[in-house]
């Protein structure tokens, strides 16, 4: 039997999908990402959303102000697409190196998405400009029609929105974010080099039973919602295969405890403190640690056309108990896997 590795040394990873929020929350959560990641694609769903170059520059500065001394971290900013967005503003931001990508939220699909896009037809001039520029489109892939069951919204999105869009704009670079279904895993796997996907730790580790059986676990509630185990297994098999167009995107989405543990709780898992160890655990369970570094550190830069990070990080096999909560000025944050014992720990 092969001896278990005790240390995993990988190139410094990047997080290709994260929510850093703003104000006190921003100051609290940024260090958990900047300590170990070289770059992160920062979601623009603030209130109001980041829709201009000036807003993105200002937000980027607030993020950098929250990065502790000694951390080597670069936030990559995104533009929030709206029906009224000017293509020229998007192009200027991309050409000036302010916007790395643009984010399509179907209106009301998730937290702070009420300004989102009503239909791809409404933003076709913007999408055509992005295709011409080679600018990546990041997609929250769910339809939002009230009559569509929440567990079916991703699969329906592929058929009714994603595939027609990619047929219409075949040169458009698309990241299908936080995929959660067998349908999406197969769709991305069978796609061409212009289609990639991010996958979160929670969708690899858990399915809807973990969230709903024996009591409801609000800190596993995120959007897209956890699906049944056959979908979880399809995601695990995709990453374990070494598929090169799937990469790390935590979708870490912090909410204060009172907003999660509520009669109408918010969607999102704050997984930044525990994500890398969680991914390592999944890859080890799937006997696929040989593909772990590529998923975390190589596949994303290749798709985005960016250099890989030069430095390295290490995870050590050391059982650690995740803290129950993290202090906020007037509340607390509950991290993903709070109170649980984890197998892999980041070496500081």
Swiss-Prot record:
Residue positions binding Zn(2+) 2: 103, 140, 178
Pfam families (alphabetical): Amidohydro_1 (PF01979)
Domain of life: Bacteria
Its EC number(s): 3.5.2.3
Keywords, sorted A to Z: Hydrolase, Metal-binding, Pyrimidine biosynthesis, Zinc
EC category: hydrolase
Pathway: Pyrimidine metabolism; UMP biosynthesis via de novo pathway; (S)-dihydroorotate from bicarbonate: step 3/3
Gene designation: pyrC
GO cellular component terms attached to this protein's record: cytosol
Residues annotated as catalytic: 251
Identification of the protein by name: Dihydroorotase
InterPro entries per the UniProt record, alphabetical: Amidohydro-rel, DHOdimr, Dihydroorotase_CS, Metal_Hydrolase
Cofactor(s) annotated in UniProt: Zn(2+)
Presence of the UniProt keyword Hydrolase in the record: yes
Positions annotated to bind substrate: 19-21, 45, 140, 223, 255, 267
GO BP annotations, alphabetical order: 'de novo' pyrimidine nucleobase biosynthetic process; 'de novo' UMP biosynthetic process
Catalytic activity: (S)-dihydroorotate + H2O = N-carbamoyl-L-aspartate + H(+)
